Amino acid sequence: MVDIRINEILGRDYLLCMVERPDIPTAKEKIEFIEVPGRENGSLTKKNGYEDVTFKIDFNLLEDYNIKPLLRRIKAWLLNAKTLSFTDDNVYRKIKSVEIGSIANEIEEYGQFEVTFVADPFEYAILQPLEITKTTTLVNSGTKYSLPKITIHGSGSITVTINDVSFLIKNVNSSVVIDSELKEAYSNTTPMNSNMIGNFPTFSEGANTIKWTGTVTKLQIDPRWRYL
């Protein structure tokens, strides 16, 4: 039976069941059409990313005791959702907001309710971080370019090149994190954006060759492959 996983905790851990697996829509691309007087080829288009995805899940709960205390714990678990996945797939979604509908609980041993989730437009592959110590080619299995998190272990000035696009990070002392999603470079709690030259790295669909110059012992990479 398919179960839901929120923040790495399964619904069954709360004795909770989905009525059925939800249908989750594909994110819509945000496109702006710009009319240009005299242009014969129609309007210009400006693409502005993707809309968030909204979906609903019905849950029920049936036990042989008063479930009201358990329902309070379940609500806290749902309202603090950061990630959501299902046990029949190896992807997860990043949750932005949660709304819990009215709970039908006239019988104290039974509860049924609907939850509305708003999620990031993408599905993300469930992967362990990768570790590399030499020039390596990674294959982006996703359907869009990804925004990785790269931890560089080394010292001094280091240049990292991905498919002939490079960035430089200076004054590295032991390690530095380059987070392309947050657009942040940092070492522990020290901001390092001012020490970085170049754009934050991305992984294109398909093959991505990673190499570097400088004193580096290893790179730890969370590639964040993503799918629409």
Please provide the spans of the model-predicted regions.
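Solvent-exposed edge beta-strands and adjacent loop segments
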Residues: M1-T54, D89-I103
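Short, acidic/charged, Gly/Pro-enriched secondary-structure junctions
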Residues: R5, N60-I100
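Short beta-strand and beta-hairpin "edge-sheet" elements
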Residues: P25-T26, T83-Q128
